[in-house]
């Protein structure tokens, strides 16, 4: 994880969508119900990503692809590793209803006095939270 973290620190950020690749970013090949992000690893690298994190060896191209057992888990572990380096207050919100509204209200109030980072919209899930971190 340390090696991936050092590459993350030196990168322009993380991307999971090849349509939004920026130069020097790291592409995480997430899978969805109707797509396999591994299939887009070469495209991500061609568009300027410096690293593609994949979990299918069939898509391993060269040293610019990092093969991991599970891409989503690698993204979550990277976010957790990064979070542990931060010296900041973290607020978690749980419940069945109203989490996004509560998050937006807290963000609005706290941003009057301090710098605030929060997930966009309702991306309060296994992908949105790591991407926010």
Model-derived segments and spans:
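N-terminal leader/targeting and accessory segments in enzymes
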Residues: 1-77, 81
